[in-house]
Amino acid sequence: MQLTVWTYEGPPHVGAMRVATGMEGLHYVLHAPQGDTYADLLFTMIERRDRRPPVTYTTFAARDLGGDTAELFKTAVQNAYERFRPQAMIVGASCTGSLIQDDPGGLAKGMGLPVPVIAIDLPAYQRKENWGAAETFYQLVRALAGPSAPPPGSKRPERAPGVRPKCNILGPTALGFRHRDDVIEITALLGKLGIDVNVTAPMGATPADLTRLGEADFNVVLYPEIASQAASWLHRIFHQPFTKTIPIGVSATREFIEEVAALAGVDAAPVLKANSSRLTWFSHSVDSTYLTGKRVFIFGDATHVVAAARIASDEIGFKVVGIGTYSREFGREIREAAKLYDVEPLITDDYLEVEAHIAELQVELVLGTQMERHISKRLGVPCAVISAPVHIQDYPARYAPQMGFEGANVIFDTWVHPLMMGLEEHLLAMFKDDFEFKDGAVPSHLGVGHSAPAVQTASSEPQPSAIETPSAAATETAAVWAADAEKELRKIPFFVRGKARRNTERFANENGVATITVETLYDAKAHFSR
């Protein structure tokens, strides 16, 4: 067990709640103590939903442990059914509730309720949130779509001539990163291809909708962390193929369109020709030193990290210096992606390890989760959020997908805005010491009679004799920078300053220099210019 102030994923029953909350007509009865009801806040405060999640807690207390907690659970199930009248119910235990081993599934099924009751048995101390969501969705699909499965060995009937192809969209849940807008974007894209959407699940689907999953010709998997297990089962039982390409970025969206068109037997050319993304042109039209070669570190769930690395490297021109994920179930995908960029993958759920890695790499942009936003703020590095878990500001009121051509536009704006433009940095460097433009200067339109606001400037504070860089903090033997050397370094143009810093530190370490001075800086320049 590890004590921490942050976790990338909650326990698996939170994943089950994400599925239940995203659906309609489904109710989740959770055998849990009073303290486990915090999960309501995730949906009402963080995602800002206008209703509570469809979850009933038994909320047993310490005094109940000496009595019949099984009867307490059965009462909660009966009351939940009578109050909400759902089409189906799922039952399970929280991580704490599983310790008393009351068997919620067996208890609920023995009650004879007139609706399907699906037991969700989640190993709370071995698995986490995304796995719990995937397992819950799989059990729902298997229980509700299974009865309409064709006989084993039978072939899937051909689609009648003139009938539009149909697909299911699988994977979006509550509390997902831009899932709501991604579904809208991909549904519109499929419509342009002449493909109808049979069911979108879990988000927006009812238990009755899940019984119709087998009617589709194929499945579109948007989030493999949630839907890959269910899609594999549908492929095996209903002979429905499913997509492998995640349409995040211009190139991936084009490949997705071609893949979907091949599965549906439609012509992709008109939609490919009508590419509405501005990312490609914008990334070529801005100042090349503003984007090209920026050192970027990417961390999050595997789906978004792999897609982001491709966009960063191939479509924007960043240099990917590190990628990682907190999801060990998808470690293989991250390791394969890391080989493409010749970097060492970071697979961990320890945010302190992630922070140390970011500091060591001396990156210029971080793409990650809410925690990487906090880390970047501490390190003074620009950051953009690309993956759950996220905070309130990443559930915007506006339309902001990540998928499709419009998603590529959103991604470009989101990633580029935190960066300082080349002209902006040059102007700040040129005028930061000017007597008219410093912080304490009187605004020119106020005249000489007004006093300047009292501002504590950095120059008025005593300066340390040496400034320690992130790399120096990372290792005890690394050289430190003298103040005059730091000042001289800032005279170097920003787009090569990072390289100059790294080369100088490397030169100092190789030659046993403890403190980097101005002379060391120029000696290193001469050394690497040979």
UniProtKB/Swiss-Prot annotation:
Pathway(s) annotated for this protein in UniProt: Porphyrin-containing compound metabolism; bacteriochlorophyll biosynthesis (light-independent)
Q: Which UniProt keywords apply?
A: 4Fe-4S, ATP-binding, Bacteriochlorophyll biosynthesis, Chlorophyll biosynthesis, Iron, Iron-sulfur, Metal-binding, Nucleotide-binding, Oxidoreductase, Photosynthesis
In which domain of life is the source organism classified? Answer: Bacteria
The EC number(s) this enzyme carries: 1.3.7.7
Which terms under GO biological process does the entry name? Answer: light-independent bacteriochlorophyll biosynthetic process; photosynthesis, dark reaction
Q: Does the keyword Cell wall biogenesis/degradation apply?
A: no
Q: Where is the composition biased (Polar residues)?
A: 454-463
Q: Which cofactor does it need?
A: [4Fe-4S] cluster
In its keyword annotation, does this UniProt entry include Hydrolase? no
The record's region (Disordered) falls at 453-472
Catalysis performed (reactions): chlorophyllide a + oxidized 2[4Fe-4S]-[ferredoxin] + 2 ADP + 2 phosphate = protochlorophyllide a + reduced 2[4Fe-4S]-[ferredoxin] + 2 ATP + 2 H2O
| Residues where substrate binds | 422-423
A GO term, aspect molecular function: oxidoreductase activity, acting on the CH-CH group of donors, iron-sulfur protein as acceptor
Q: What note does UniProt attach to the cofactor annotation?
A: Binds 1 [4Fe-4S] cluster per heterodimer. The cluster is bound at the heterodimer interface by residues from both subunits.
May I ask which residue range the UniProt record assigns to the signal sequence? none
Write out the catalytic residues in the record: 287
Instruction: Cite the binding residues for [4Fe-4S] cluster.
Output: 36
Family to which the UniProt record says this protein belongs: Belongs to the ChlB/BchB/BchZ family.
Q: How does it assemble?
A: Protochlorophyllide reductase is composed of three subunits; BchL, BchN and BchB. Forms a heterotetramer of two BchB and two BchN subunits.
Function of the molecule: Component of the dark-operative protochlorophyllide reductase (DPOR) that uses Mg-ATP and reduced ferredoxin to reduce ring D of protochlorophyllide (Pchlide) to form chlorophyllide a (Chlide). This reaction is light-independent. The NB-protein (BchN-BchB) is the catalytic component of the complex.
| Listed name of the protein | Light-independent protochlorophyllide reductase subunit B
